[in-house]
């Protein structure tokens, strides 16, 4: 289906309204959670995009958001507008743009911490503190487990990768061994 609407326009409109209402920071966590739910749960995403589910039912869900937090009224109206105009396929993209705008204003960087094993909260706090000092921004850390790392960790922040793990070390050694001009093969 061809969509003539612009996700940037929707995101900017929501951002400007929240800024005007001074609700940018008070709604950030809720909207981020909603975005993550849509991104990770295909059933929820399909609900908003389904032509078989009526507008009233979708609008009811948007209204329920306001029950949790009165500052989300503009966001609920934003959802209803997208749904009413049959632009729900733009929802993820518009929210992604909106979140980037808000994170820029609030000086927030998102980081992924990928490790071979679960990392305790104390260590996460230390990592966040070090990253906040390095980047001079508030860090939102999301953790993932990747057994292929064997031990150690990898932190991804935008295009930056900080890694200390066995998998990366083994790949470097392998590349040296296989490289004809490398140190080991002369």
From Swiss-Prot:
GO terms for cellular component: plasma membrane; proton-transporting ATP synthase complex. The keyword Hydrolase does not apply. Keywords: ATP synthesis, Cell membrane, CF(1), Hydrogen ion transport, Ion transport, Membrane, Transport. Its main location: membrane. GO terms for molecular function: proton-transporting ATP synthase activity, rotational mechanism. It is a peripheral membrane protein. InterPro entries: ATP_synth_OSCP/delta_N_sf, ATPase_OSCP/dsu. Transmembrane segments: none annotated. It is found in: Cell membrane. The keyword Transport applies. F-type ATPases have 2 components, F(1) - the catalytic core - and F(0) - the membrane proton channel. F(1) has five subunits: alpha(3), beta(3), gamma(1), delta(1), epsilon(1). F(0) has three main subunits: a(1), b(2) and c(10-14). The alpha and beta chains form an alternating ring which encloses part of the gamma chain. F(1) is attached to F(0) by a central stalk formed by the gamma and epsilon chains, while a peripheral stalk is formed by the delta and b chains. F(1)F(0) ATP synthase produces ATP from ADP in the presence of a proton or sodium gradient. F-type ATPases consist of two structural domains, F(1) containing the extramembraneous catalytic core and F(0) containing the membrane proton channel, linked together by a central stalk and a peripheral stalk. During catalysis, ATP synthesis in the catalytic domain of F(1) is coupled via a rotary mechanism of the central stalk subunits to proton translocation. This protein is part of the stalk that links CF(0) to CF(1). It either transmits conformational changes from CF(0) to CF(1) or is implicated in proton conduction. Belongs to the ATPase delta chain family. This is ATP synthase subunit delta. The gene is atpH.
């Amino acid at each position: 289906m061809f969509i003539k609407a612009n996700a940037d326009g929707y995101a900017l409109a929501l951002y400007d309204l929240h800024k005007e209402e001074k609700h940018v920071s008070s709604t950030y966590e809720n909207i981020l959670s909603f975005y993550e739910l849509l991104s990770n749960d295909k059933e929820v995403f399909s609900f908003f995009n389904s032509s078989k589910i009526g507008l009233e039912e979708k609008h009811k869900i948007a209204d329920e958001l306001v029950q949790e937090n009165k500052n989300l009224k503009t966001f609920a109206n934003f959802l209803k507008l997208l749904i009413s105009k049959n632009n729900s396929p733009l929802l993820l993209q518009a929210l992604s743009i909106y979140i980037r705008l808000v994170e820029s204003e609030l000086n927030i960087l998102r980081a992924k911490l990928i490790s071979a094993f679960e990392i305790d909260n104390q260590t996460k706090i230390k990592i966040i503190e070090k990253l906040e000092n390095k980047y001079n921004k508030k860090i939102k850390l999301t953790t993932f487990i990747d057994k292929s790392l064997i031990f150690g960790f990898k932190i991804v922040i935008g295009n930056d990768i900080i890694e200390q793990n066995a998998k990366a070390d083994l790949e470097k050694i392998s590349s040296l061994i296989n490289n004809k001009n490398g140190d080991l093969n002369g």
